[in-house]
């Protein structure tokens, strides 16, 4: 790869830039791959409600850990009585039942139970009280609880994903930064602009989001409060400003800037706005991401001749190369436990794939069957990865379980969707 190609790569990836077209329409969930064998779980329609059970069923299916049973179910299940023998005969080990009841102040009580057929006991027996406007959110919370009860791992169905859209149908081909549920439902627009919006990055409390905007005709990093809509400029230095990433305590931000001529990584103290230059060489250093413990960060650099992932330690200011397999490794992001890196990987002679590298062993496993993949982002529990890809000429988001058992697509009917970022919990 020539220096010209590497610089082009840095300008695109340090800012997360992808020139594509997208629509404002809601994303539509499409199952691309389902697990061949997974424990069955029956989600019985809830009493007085027909909206909750399909959401829970869909959530658990797309985890890759379970397969919902929806046909020829025993009719004896209710919130008060479950006949274990009927479910044993049907070969279904887990059953979810529930009901919805009106409560005061335009709210609802959602009572749900998770039943272990073999043990003949309830694993969950809970009541949620939610406003009428949050019944869908309650369904995702039920999915989270069921997933944790059966796997011991916190569920991420009630989370959110940020992404960037561009609508080619409008005269100015407008960009929007949107946030939606992890199944693509309930999209909300954070910002709309005729100029590119790139590299969304959540603050650790998920109350604010940073992004790169070209509204002044040059890249600048903004921080926007999601509740109030208020925003402020964090970085608008001469040249490149991109790839923001927040420290686990939310007090600092790493970003790429070329104010001194070469793309380097800087750290900003968000209370004082003081800068510290973290890299200083002739290479292109970009895409910094803090480790979960805040003691180091990973980044992409071409200092070895091709884009690879490196780690910088705050303790001794040392830098260590992490990736050695493949001609290209970039856009690294760490799992919440700090053990794995999801990255864009290109084996020699192949297309760009999302892969997961175990940091302790250095083993890189290609995760995705698609090509031209970019922008991987782990779910908070580390069990799923969302990324942008193409299927034919269609640009879309895809979510895949890290064991490769399940994949779903989130396309827009009228355009393309890019730059996903999974919100922290």
UniProtKB/Swiss-Prot annotation:
Function field: Part of the Tol-Pal system, which plays a role in outer membrane invagination during cell division and is important for maintaining outer membrane integrity.
Family (UniProt): Belongs to the TolB family.
A Gene Ontology biological process term: protein import
Cleavable signal peptide: 1-25
Subcellular location: Periplasm
Domain of life: Bacteria
GO CC annotation, single: periplasmic space
Protein name: Tol-Pal system protein TolB
Main location: periplasm
Native source organism of the sequence: Acinetobacter baylyi (strain ATCC 33305 / BD413 / ADP1)
PANTHER family xref list: PROTEIN TOLB, PROTEIN TOLB HOMOLOG
Matches recorded under InterPro entries: 6-blade_b-propeller_TolB-like (IPR011042), PD40 (IPR011659), Tol-Pal_TolB (IPR014167), TolB_N (IPR007195)
Keyword field contains Nucleus: no
Entries under NCBIfam families matching the protein: propeller_TolB (TIGR02800)
Subunit structure of this chain's protein: The Tol-Pal system is composed of five core proteins: the inner membrane proteins TolA, TolQ and TolR, the periplasmic protein TolB and the outer membrane protein Pal. They form a network linking the inner and outer membranes and the peptidoglycan layer.
Keywords, comma-separated and alphabetical: Cell cycle, Cell division, Periplasm, Signal
């Amino acid at each position: 790869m020539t220096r010209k190609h590497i610089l082009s790569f840095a300008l695109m990836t340090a800012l997360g830039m992808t020139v594509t077209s997208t629509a404002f329409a809601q994303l539509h969930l499409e199952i691309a791959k389902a697990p061949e064998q997974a424990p069955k779980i029956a989600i019985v329609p809830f009493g007085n409600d027909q909206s909750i059970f399909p959401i829970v069923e869909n959530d658990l299916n797309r985890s890759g850990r379970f397969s919902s049973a929806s046909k020829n179910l025993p009719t004896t299940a209710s919130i008060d009585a479950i006949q274990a023998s009927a479910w044993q005969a049907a070969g279904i080990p887990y059953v979810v039942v529930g009901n919805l009841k009106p409560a005061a102040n335009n709210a609802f009580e959602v009572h749900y139970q998770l039943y272990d057929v073999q043990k003949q006991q309830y694993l969950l027996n809970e009541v949620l009280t939610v406003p009428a406007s949050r019944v869908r959110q309650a369904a995702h919370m039920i999915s989270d609880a069921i997933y944790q009860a059966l796997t011991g791992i916190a569920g991420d169905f009630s989370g959110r994903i940020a992404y960037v859209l561009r609508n080619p149908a409008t005269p100015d081909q407008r960009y929007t930064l949107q946030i939606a549920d992890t199944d693509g439902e309930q999209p909300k627009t954070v910002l709309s602009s005729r100029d590119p919006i790139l590299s969304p990055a959540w603050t650790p409390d998920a109350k604010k989001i940073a992004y790169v905007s070209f509204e002044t005709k040059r890249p600048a990093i903004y921080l926007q409060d999601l509740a109030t809509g208020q925003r402020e400029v964090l970085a608008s230095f001469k040249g490149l400003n991109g790839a923001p990433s927040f420290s686990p305590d939310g007090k600092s931000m790493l970003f790429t800037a070329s104010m001194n001529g070469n793309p380097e990584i800087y750290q900003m103290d968000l209370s004082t706005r003081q800068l510290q230059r973290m890299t200083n060489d002739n290479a292109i250093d970009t895409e910094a991401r803090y480790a979960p413990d805040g003691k180091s960060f990973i980044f992409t650099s071409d200092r070895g001749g091709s884009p690879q992932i490196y780690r910088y330690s705050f303790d001794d200011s040392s830098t260590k190369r992490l990736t050695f397999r493949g001609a290209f490794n970039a856009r690294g992001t760490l799992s919440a436990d700090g053990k794995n890196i999801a990255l864009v990987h290109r084996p020699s002679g192949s297309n760009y794939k999302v892969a997961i590298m175990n940091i302790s062993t250095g083993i890189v496993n290609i995760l995705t069957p698609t090509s031209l993949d970019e922008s991987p982002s782990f779910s908070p529990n580390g069990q799923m990865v969302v990324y942008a890809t193409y299927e034919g000429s269609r640009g879309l988001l895809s979510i895949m379980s890290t064991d490769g058992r399940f994949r779903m697509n989130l396309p827009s009917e009228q355009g393309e969707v890019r730059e996903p970022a999974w919100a922290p919990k």
